[in-house]
C-alpha cells in the first residue's frame, strides 16, 4: 500500500478479527481508534482508564477488553487493543503503523536546486515536455554504457 500526499486523505483497509475496517493513516496518533458506530456490538469493550487527547471532546471512551488479531493493508500480521469512541472515521495510529512497517519518505529530487532554477528561468514547466509545444520528453534520458566499444568515438 502506498499513498502520495494530496488533497485526499490517506485511507487504507485493515481486517480486525476477520472484519474489514477502513481507517485514516494517522502518524500523529499514538493508538488506533475505532469509531463507536462501527464497533461490533458483540465485541467486548470496557471504559477506558485514560482519556484521548487531540480528537476534540470525547465523552465516552472505551477500549477493547481483548488484544485483537489484525491484518494490515498488505496482509501484515499485527495485534491491536484499540480505543473506541464517537469519531467520524477510524484512525490507524502508530501502534499499528509500526507493526505494518510503515514509512514516510520524501523522494530525492532528480536535479539539484540550482539546475532546477536555471531550467525554470529558461521557461521549463515541471511535468511538461521541453520544446516549443512542451511536447518533448518528460523524463531524463538514461546513459547507457557501450560494452562493445563500437560507434561514435570508437574505432571500427
UniProtKB/Swiss-Prot annotation:
One example GO MF annotation: nucleic acid binding
SMART domains, per database record: G_patch
Matching InterPro entries: Aspartic_peptidase_AS (IPR001969), G_patch_dom (IPR000467), HERV-K_Pro_peptidase_A2 (IPR051592), Peptidase_A2_cat (IPR001995), Peptidase_aspartic_dom_sf (IPR021109), Retropepsin-like_cat_dom (IPR034170), Retropepsins (IPR018061)
Annotated transmembrane regions: none
Keyword Transport belongs to the record: no
Source superkingdom: Eukaryota
Catalytic reactions on record: Processing at the authentic HIV-1 PR recognition site and release of the mature p17 matrix and the p24 capsid protein, as a result of the cleavage of the -SQNY-|-PIVQ- cleavage site
Domain G-patch: 111-156
Active site, UniProt feature: 26
EC number(s) per entry: 3.4.23.50
Annotated CDD domains: HIV_retropepsin_like
Record flagged with keyword Transport: no
Residue span(s) of domain Peptidase A2: 21-96
Enzyme class: hydrolase
Post-translational modification: Autoproteolytically processed at the N-terminus. Expected C-terminal autoprocessing not detected. The sequence shown is that of the processed Pro protein.
Keywords attached to this entry: Aspartyl protease, Autocatalytic cleavage, ERV, Hydrolase, Protease, Transposable element
Any GO BP: proteolysis
Pfam families: G-patch, RVP
Family: Belongs to the peptidase A2 family. HERV class-II K(HML-2) subfamily.
Subunit structure comment from the entry: Active as a homodimer.
Task of the protein: Retroviral proteases have roles in the processing of the primary translation products and the maturation of the viral particle. Endogenous Pro proteins may have kept, lost or modified their original function during evolution.
Protein name stated in the entry: Endogenous retrovirus group K member 21 Pro protein
Organism: Homo sapiens (Human)
